[in-house]
Amino acid sequence: MHPKVDALLSRFPRITLIPWETPIQYLPRISRELGVDVYVKRDDLTGLGIGGNKIRKLEFLLGDALSRGCDTVITIGAVHSNHAFVTALAAKKLGLGAVLILRGEEVLKGNYLLDKLMGIETRIYEADNSWELMKVAEEVAEELKGEGKKPYIIPPGGASPVGTLGYIRGVGELYTQVKKLGLRIDTVVDAVGSGGTYAGLLLGSAIVNAEWSVVGIDVSSATEKAKERVKNLVEKTKELLGINVKVQEPRIYDYGFGAYGKIVKEVAKLIKSVGTMEGLLLDPVYTGKAFYGLMDLAKKGDLGESVLFIHTGGLPGIFHYGEEMLELLV
């Protein structure tokens, strides 16, 4: 880890959920095709359940919940949410209760199937986006308090200042690995949904004085909202840490193809191509769109000569949308 990051984060309660450093993998065939060195930070291999980026945030979020004496976690997401499932699974692992506030069609596939297999309490509502359900989460929290419980609300994607600490710590790990391997990285690329991971990458990179730029790929086609959310998270996290560092302006590009969760032929073909060329599995909601954006920007010369992709996980998305993807590939 990075000593400056360790010192900054030492006063915040953290539960260890990731037992190892996630590896950095080189993609030789993709690199040859693009004429750019492409590396992947395998945060799909974080170890708990289906893995993924959210577990870095949960180390601090659940550490905070336990330090406050909370006994039940409430969080929000789409029916196929990776974040919602791993949050509930991690909570159960720690002996906590969990309630998931979900939106979308109730279909027993992907993460929703895992929710049911693990006996996780789910409540389905109608909403255009997960942030609209924060009020519902607060109402559920009041209901649980009436039952004598002490709930802890985690916002969509774990996008809060406390959650952002997880990716500041992740940058400390990444920076140390890159130096140890003797790599020069021009650009780090990340999928942007709720924005917490990207905010942590921006702030963490500023703290360690990294030489790379951090690019976000908007998977929801809500780029201006994403930029504002990221800026707000960065400022609030700086306040939490008590620091004042200059942070790169968000560089977020729209590759959402019109909407969050919209499955398109271009991304389905990309997922197949990357899988067969490199043995690397991407999902159609987050990492597939983000890697599509990476390849398009790299071809335009916008990412420099060496790029590192943060693989944020999301494998169940393949199974949730598998039939749609197969139809698009015919």
Curated annotation (Swiss-Prot):
Record keyword Chloroplast present: no
Entries under InterPro entries matching the protein: ACCD_DCysDesulf, D-Cys_desShydrase, TrpB-like_PALP, TrpB-like_PALP_sf
Entry keyword set: Hydrolase, Pyridoxal phosphate
Residues annotated with N6-(pyridoxal phosphate)lysine modification: K54
Keyword Hydrolase: yes
Enzyme Commission number(s) from the entry: 3.5.99.7
Gene3D superfamilies, A to Z: 3.40.50.1100
Molecular function (Gene Ontology), one example: D-cysteine desulfhydrase activity
Superkingdom, taxonomy of origin: Archaea
Catalytic activity: 1-aminocyclopropane-1-carboxylate + H2O = 2-oxobutanoate + NH4(+)
Cofactor(s) listed in the protein's UniProt record: pyridoxal 5'-phosphate
Family under the similarity heading: Belongs to the ACC deaminase/D-cysteine desulfhydrase family.
Protein name (record): Putative 1-aminocyclopropane-1-carboxylate deaminase
